[in-house]
Amino acid sequence: MSKSENLYSAARELIPGGVNSPVRAFTGVGGTPLFIERADGAFLYDVDGKAYIDYVGSWGPMVLGHNHPTIRNAVIEAAQRGLSFGAPTEMEVKMAELVTELVPTMDMVRMVNSGTEATMSAIRLARGFTGRDKIIKFEGCYHGHADCLLVKAGSGALTLGQPNSPGVPADFAKHTLTCTYNDLDTVRAAFEQYPQEVACIIVEPVAGNMNCIPPQPDFLPGLRALCDEFGALLIIDEVMTGFRVALAGAQSYYDVVPDLTCLGKIIGGGMPVGAFGGRKDVMEALAPTGPVYQAGTLSGNPIAMAAGFACLTEVAQPGIHETLTDLTAQLANGLLEAAEETGVPLVVNHVGGMFGIFFTDAKTVTCYQDVVKCDVERFKRFFHLMLEEGVYLAPSAFEAGFMSVAHSVEDINKTIDAARKVFAKL
């Protein structure tokens, strides 16, 4: 047995499923998950000494590549002054200044510890601010594992084949209205059914938890218009897309102004950080200035703030997003060419530094219904054969892939060559 297999066997005796987040268990592809010993740049190194070109990037945060020296040194320096104080620090102020500068729609920001905390808190704030209970989300979109959001969710829920999680009371779920991504008619119908009851829409501006689905040109502006018409708030969940699709997020790329924005992943540089923010009048409804309660023992802790500040400072440097976008486009185009050469039907969606691979005869993949028609069994074979070639992709047909600026053109070409070889075997 390999060392990964031995560790996985031991882990399953102590940790449910052997992992601390379900998709890591390779449930979506079968087999034994890799146990990682270290990572550097664009590469992962497992406990058995094998190296892999990594397109998971810790599920999105590693836009600069793994073990970036600026972030690492910032963490070391901060740790020497103490790990957590439970009191305000100067770095929290600097971080808030930087985030609100980079994302102009955020007048104020509150730091939390995860993307789930960010979306959960933003929805509570929207409900408190509007005095309404219902929310609109989209089929196949994942916004963390808060109870009200685990209704027809994407990501791990799709991987497990469970659109709704047991343990979510029907009384909670009844306030969540689910519409079709990229279909404004379903959203208008929901509003017209409950014209005075919808507090907010929450949406991934690029759906990254049913693989990678960009919005149609009229979709996000249409959501903004509907929120204005019916007096609801628009929450854009940029946990995945923030600082990756563009410096100011997908909202700037697609030119839409939300009332609230949720951030995660890149904002922490690899440390557990989330944030939510937006209009000043809405944010001032939060405790202690307002009645909507939200708190966290480790929120804004000095280690995470130091890592996040260092990461965002680097990400804001000129040329970063142009490089990220160019590398992603090179990979996507190369995969499509290799698939065409070998007669494999393939769609590759991409925007900014994220991409999605779909085995399908369809010409486009634009919504949940398109995604679930794709050939999952072929993806499973593709995943394992690519792993043998030293390429680590997301271990699920329903997860997006992530590029970093640490990837080289040589890494991209090696990946395309590996895919060409693998496509010929499918």
UniProtKB/Swiss-Prot annotation:
Domain of life: Bacteria
Positions carrying N6-(pyridoxal phosphate)lysine: 265
Keywords: Cytoplasm, Isomerase, Porphyrin biosynthesis, Pyridoxal phosphate
Localization (cell): Cytoplasm
Cofactors named for this entry: pyridoxal 5'-phosphate
InterPro entries on file: 4pyrrol_synth_GluAld_NH2Trfase, Aminotrans_3, Aminotrans_3_PPA_site, PyrdxlP-dep_Trfase, PyrdxlP-dep_Trfase_major, PyrdxlP-dep_Trfase_small
Gene3D superfamilies reported for this sequence: Aspartate Aminotransferase, domain 1 (3.90.1150.10), Type I PLP-dependent aspartate aminotransferase-like (Major domain) (3.40.640.10)
Matches recorded under SUPFAM superfamilies: PLP-dependent transferases
GO CC terms, sorted: cytoplasm
UniProt record, GO biological process: protoporphyrinogen IX biosynthetic process
Record carries keyword Signal: no
Pfam families: Aminotran_3
Record GO terms (molecular function): glutamate-1-semialdehyde 2,1-aminomutase activity; pyridoxal phosphate binding; transaminase activity
The protein's assembly and partners: Homodimer.
PANTHER family: GLUTAMATE-1-SEMIALDEHYDE 2,1-AMINOMUTASE, GLUTAMATE-1-SEMIALDEHYDE 2,1-AMINOMUTASE 1, CHLOROPLASTIC-RELATED
Name the record gives this protein: Glutamate-1-semialdehyde 2,1-aminomutase
Organism the protein comes from: Enterobacter sp. (strain 638)
Lineage, opening ranks: Bacteria, Pseudomonadati, Pseudomonadota, Gammaproteobacteria, Enterobacterales
